[in-house]
Amino acid sequence: MNLQLASMAIAMPAVHGHPNREPFRGVLTLVDTPSDKPPAGSRGHRVILTRTAAERALPSLLGMALDYSPSFDRHDARRKIGVITQAEIVGKELELSGYLFAKDFPEIVKQIESGIIHAGGTPRKRAQNPLGMSYEIADASVADVRAKIWSLTHVTFTGAAILRRDKAAYRDTWIELE
């Protein structure tokens, strides 16, 4: 077994019982793996985030915001509900951790904790938490724009979003409270 690991973090001072810091962790995306469906901005192309591009871009994730939309079906960069403090690539998974703003968004924390989503007004629970994550990028370079599946060779992460796994480009993403 060949395990590759790249990791970065920013140190947040420990504040026991802080009401607005709820630790989270999860998988943002998979590297060197084609997306399950085309992400927004890819002109209908599925994408592969190369390991090299992801490793080089890890520093750009730190301190970036985690956002959501009320229906958990898209990104909404104006609804920032948390901050990313650590990012690492373990195997093919780009793992994140950080803090949700729990006092400001208690309903989101509760939905992640319970696995219940209220999209469309009707609460429903699934056996597996239905929420995942999706990355937000800028300055992307594509190896060959004529390719059926775009290979991203350079990116700058500008944040991430919590959304329903069935709406994410990579369905094997997830988020949970620590």
Q: PLM ranges: what are they?
A:
Residues 45-57, 83-88, 114-118:
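Short low-complexity stretches enriched in small and charged residues
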Residues 29-40, 55-56, 72-77, 103-110, ...:
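Short, surface-exposed beta-strand/loop "edge" segments at domain boundaries and coil↔beta transitions
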Residues 88-178:
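Residue microenvironments linked to proteolytic maturation
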Residues 22-26, 64-66, 94, 133, ...:
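A broad, low-specificity signal marking well-ordered, structured residues that form hydrophobic/aromatic
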